[in-house]
Amino acid sequence: MNKRRILFVCLGNICRSPMAEYVLRHQAAERGLSHLVETASAGTSGWHDGEGMHRGTRAELKAHGIAADGFSSRKIRREDPAHYDLIIAMDDDNLAELERQFG
């Protein structure tokens, strides 16, 4: 079975979308399903490109036993919609921005 590629998207890609990315990845690993899911995240803006996760997000993940190592924020790219099977906007404003950018 092919991996399902899931992209979570919020505004800056330092809080909500990376948290969703890491939680889903962790949940899949706990259930032995990592081979079925590829997760990633991005932002609709490039304000925080290359930055790490917000410290509060990292702390919350750590409190739940989820390591948040190696994260670097990024803006959604033109090729992302073709690469991912499912893109989840973290709120209505980001959904509207995705629709504006990608139709």
PLM features per residue range, with description:
Residues 74-103:
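Glycine/proline-rich loop-helix segments at beta-alpha junctions forming the active-site rim
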Residues 1-84:
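Conserved active-site segments centered on acidic
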